[in-house]
Structures are given as C-alpha cells and as structure tokens.
Swiss-Prot record:
CDD domains: GT4_PimA-like. PANTHER family: GLYCOSYLTRANSFERASE WBBK-RELATED. It comes from Komagataeibacter xylinus (Gluconacetobacter xylinus). GO terms for biological process: lipopolysaccharide biosynthetic process. It catalyses: beta-D-Glc-(1->4)-alpha-D-Glc-di-trans,octa-cis-undecaprenyl diphosphate + GDP-alpha-D-mannose = alpha-D-Man-(1->3)-beta-D-Glc-(1->4)-alpha-D-Glc-1-di-trans,octa-cis-undecaprenyl diphosphate + GDP + H(+). Belongs to the glycosyltransferase group 1 family. Glycosyltransferase 4 subfamily. Gene3D superfamilies: Glycogen Phosphorylase B. Changing residue 211 to A: Abolishes catalytic activity. Involved in the biosynthesis of the exopolysaccharide acetan, a water-soluble polysaccharide involved in production of bacterial cellulose (BC). The gene is aceC. It is an enzyme of class 2 (transferase). It comes from the Bacteria. Changing residue 127 to A: Decreases strongly catalytic activity. This is GDP-mannose:cellobiosyl-diphosphopolyprenol alpha-mannosyltransferase.
C-alpha cells in the first residue's frame, strides 16, 4: 500500500474495533453501515481491523474476510474481553491515511500511546465509552479520569455518538469533542410492525446484563395482571447471559409461558417477528445511542423504554411511547396498558409518528458528516465527485 496519497486520490480509512460482524450489537451494526456507505456512496476505501473471535462463542474467524463488500482483517488477542490485547495492530496500519478507532478500549489507548512511533492521523468514536455495565465500575471511573484524558491527546477529534456520550466525554475531551449521532439502515425494518394491534412486546439485541431483561419481564408480569393477552418475544444472541438464563429469569417472574426466545435471527426473521408485535421493549441501564429503539420505531413499533438520556431524547423529538421508571414499574405498566387498549383507534397515527422520528437518523447523512470531518482533520478535500454524490443524498 502507498502511505502517501494526493488530494485527488482515493482516501484510505481503517476502522478499528474489538468486535465486528458476525458479532451482533449496536457498535457492530453502526460500523457496518458507516463503512458500507463510505465505500458505496463516497468512494472512500474503508476497511475494518478487528479481533478474530466473537466474544462468548467458541472458535476463530478467518484472518482475512470480506463482509458486505468491506475488507476485514482479524487479529488474534489475549487477556480479557473487557480489555483485549492485540499489540500487533501496529503491523496493519501503515498504508492508511486515517485511523478511525471505535469505542474506548485497548486499541484506543495503545494507538494513542504508540503515536510517536506510527504518527497516524486518528479520530475516535465513543459508542458509549466503557460504562455499559456496572462491572469494575470503580476501576473504570479511575481509568476514565486518569488514563483516558492522556490517550485523548493523540486524537484529532473525539466523536460522541450520542448526546449522552457528549455529556460523559465533555471534560476528558474538551476542545476535541464533537457530536455525530449514529444512524440506522432506513430500509432494513421500515414499516414492519404488525398491522393488527396487539399486546406483544418485541425485545431484540444481545442477551446482556445491562439490557435488564429481567426488569422487562417484571413489567410484563404487571401488564398481564391487567390483561392476559400480553406476551413478549426476545430475539438476539448470547452475551454475558444465555437463553437459558433468560428463561430462568422469566420463570422467576411468573411469565415463562408468555415468553418466546429466538436465538440468532436473520434480518428477515427479525422483520417477521416485528410483524407479530405492536410494541418494542428496552429497559436498559445504559445505551450509547439506542440503535435498537430507533430501528423498532422505523418499523412502526410503539417503544416502551427506560428513562435514560438517549431514550428521553427520542421522546423529546416526538416519539410516541412509554417511559418507565425502573424503580417504580407500576405507572409505566398502567400507561402501556392504556395505550394498548386505545390501539384500535390510534395505531396508524402512532406508527406514522414513530416512523417519522426514526427517519431523521439516516446513515447516508451520517457518513457525509464523517467525510467532512475526515477532510477537516486531514486538511485536504475528498474528490469533488464523491462529495457531490454525498451532498445529493
């Protein structure tokens, strides 16, 4: 690869992250959509460098791969999944104009501390930082106040993927911080929700502790006290919880017979599950952006959400749904039942309203914003034809 590029030549960008497809999650999906838009619509030669396993699954993935047209290189690693070590990353960055690091982990710190050796132009996207769970929280807080601010200095810009991330990083990344909210694939699940109003809740994503699915099961138990027609479908893949763990939680809440778990659904299968539901549920303790909620709204589902910052922002933008206080589920359950009872008259209006809010989160626009940021930090323009195509989106 040529390490030196003229302004009229293809820009080479290496996206670096610890997990990518076939792993499933908000970060993985966001990066897939961004890199795909960059390659297909902006003429940016975007590649991905990641680790060679899906956390929680046995086996190794191929060292070289192509995912949806995106070249992928995977590295062996050691240590903990919370901070996986892969120092050989330095062997793979030489031919790129810009390194785009995703999330705050080993790659973020190591590439910063070795910057005097490689001297690459770098930006980083936050994706929620590393506060997705309470695990090791005290250590994380100390790290975030001491190590992270030093690492930040090696990056031209730190991109908050949500306004809650911007609040989190505003002190450690002062002067470098900008906000570019994530987008969604607007065609993936658009208008997929059931046309027949019902009391089925769909939850989808990783089976992870911070998603607080047990809390959602407790809410369903309260809802079933109002109307026995309430049930829940949980679709996703094992993470730090398994499908058996979820069944045990549902059993403890008395709703085992009202739960259906679908492991590892394809997009087509997930779209089909949306066609069985009227509601989407997520009572997560933390979300960097809330990708699944926005995707659910694009399908026309009515969201039932915890009162964390990214979800509150969706409601402020006009989403039609229910915000639940995790410390007091009863009022949220009452509101959800009232909304379900009114669906025969209100479903079409709620569907249109939620789809409209979701339509504002478009990956083509997000990719264009990142392209402008790349121009800024590199001090050079992308080819005019590419930027004109981006502006036409």
């Amino acid at each position: 690869m040529n390490s030196k590029k003229r302004g009229d030549e293809t820009l080479k960008v290496l996206h670096i992250c610890r997990q990518f497809s076939p792993s499933v999650g908000g970060l993985e999906d966001s990066l897939l959509n961004l890199a795909r838009s960059q390659r297909q619509r902006l003429g940016i030669d975007a590649e991905v460098l990641t680790l060679d396993t899906v956390f929680g699954r046995p086996g190794k993935l191929p060292h070289r791969d192509v995912v949806d047209g995106i070249p992928v290189t995977r590295l062996a690693w050691r240590g903990s999944t919370k901070y996986p070590l892969a120092p050989q990353v330095l062997r793979h960055i030489g031919g790129f104009d810009l390194l785009h690091v995703h999330a705050i982990d080993f790659f973020f710190d190591f590439l910063a501390w070795t910057w005097p050796l490689h001297r690459k132009t770098m930006i980083a996207s936050t994706h929620g930082g590393f506060f997705h769970t309470g695990a090791l929280r005290r250590i994380k807080e100390i790290w975030f106040r001491t190590i992270t601010p030093i690492s930040v200095r090696a990056y031209k810009k730190i991109v908050a993927c949500s306004y809650s991330d911007a609040d989190l990083f505003r002190h450690v990344a002062a002067g470098r911080l900008i906000t570019i909210e994530n987008g969604i694939n607007q065609t993936r699940f658009r208008d997929a929700a059931s046309r027949t109003p019902n009391r089925t809740i769909l939850a989808f994503g990783r089976f992870a502790v911070h998603k607080r699915l047990k809390l959602l099961f407790q809410l369903v138990a309260l809802l079933r006290a109002y109307n026995s027609g309430w049930n829940i479908i949980v679709a996703g893949q094992d993470s730090n919880l398994t499908a058996d763990d979820l069944r045990a939680q549902a059993r403890a809440c008395g709703i085992e017979d009202s739960l259906r778990i679908v492991s590892g659904p394809s997009d087509a299968e997930l779209r089909g599950l949306m066609g069985e539901a009227s509601f989407f549920g997520c009572l997560s303790a933390h979300e960097g952006f809330g990708l699944a909620a926005v995707e659910a709204m694009s399908a026309g589902l009515v969201p039932i959400l915890s009162n964390i910052t990214p979800f509150a922002r969706l409601m402020q933008q006009g989403a039609a749904g229910v915000m639940v206080n995790p410390d007091n589920l009863a009022p949220g359950a009452r509101e959800a039942e009232d909304m379900a009872a009114a669906l025969p008259e209100t479903a079409d209006a709620l569907r249109a309203r939620n789809m409209d809010v979701a339509s504002r989160y478009d990956w083509h626009s997000v990719a264009h914003e990142y392209a402008r940021l790349y121009q800024q930090v590199l001090g050079r323009a992308l080819p005019e034809a590419n930027m004109a195509a981006a502006g036409a989106e």
